[in-house]
Amino acid sequence: MWDARAVRRIGHRGAKGHSPENTIESFAKALELGCDEIETDVWLADDGRLLISHDRPGPDLKLTLQEVLDFCRGKLAVNVELKSEMSEKAAQETGGSVGKLLAERRDPDAYVSSFWWAALEGCRVAGPAVRRAFIFADSPDRSSLMESARGMRLWALHPNRTYVTPELVKAAHATGVKVNAWTVNEPREIARFREWGVDGIMSDFPERVPKD
């Protein structure tokens, strides 16, 4: 489903600007809006379920990652953000659980992303073939970041929109790593990122990301 010639239209938490985030309704809206991919958030619950929520899920939350993957399969790629409490152990367990599920499903259009290196490592151990992306919202040393990307065999970097630069995109591509920016809602910024060669743009209003 990846077209190297076009910028990916990625719906942030589905189509957050139009429908309640991280719901089947929102993912269906993203599909209606012509998204190539959706981003969603997953937590490992105490009972072992993988629950969909941006914040730590409450007792009434029931939507699971399995259900989202089933809905999206063959229609939308899925960027699964691995969420965790402030604990590397918990992050690694979450990554391991999601990595195991994705490896078992062998879904080529699903991958993981996280702020937590431990979560990405947990996924790598449980599902070595599952693609992984590192999320950041700061300005890390570029050479160190690329070295880490190579060492972790990352598929992509996911910088916050504030930290996207032409130099970052160029360095990532030279390393063999894609760049998917978040969360980009302003048309002028979307146009600028396209000019810089960003591979994917996550947006609350994904219809604003041109398809050609």
Give the label of every model feature segment.
Residues 1-212:
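Phosphate-group recognition and catalysis centered on beta-loop-alpha active-site segments
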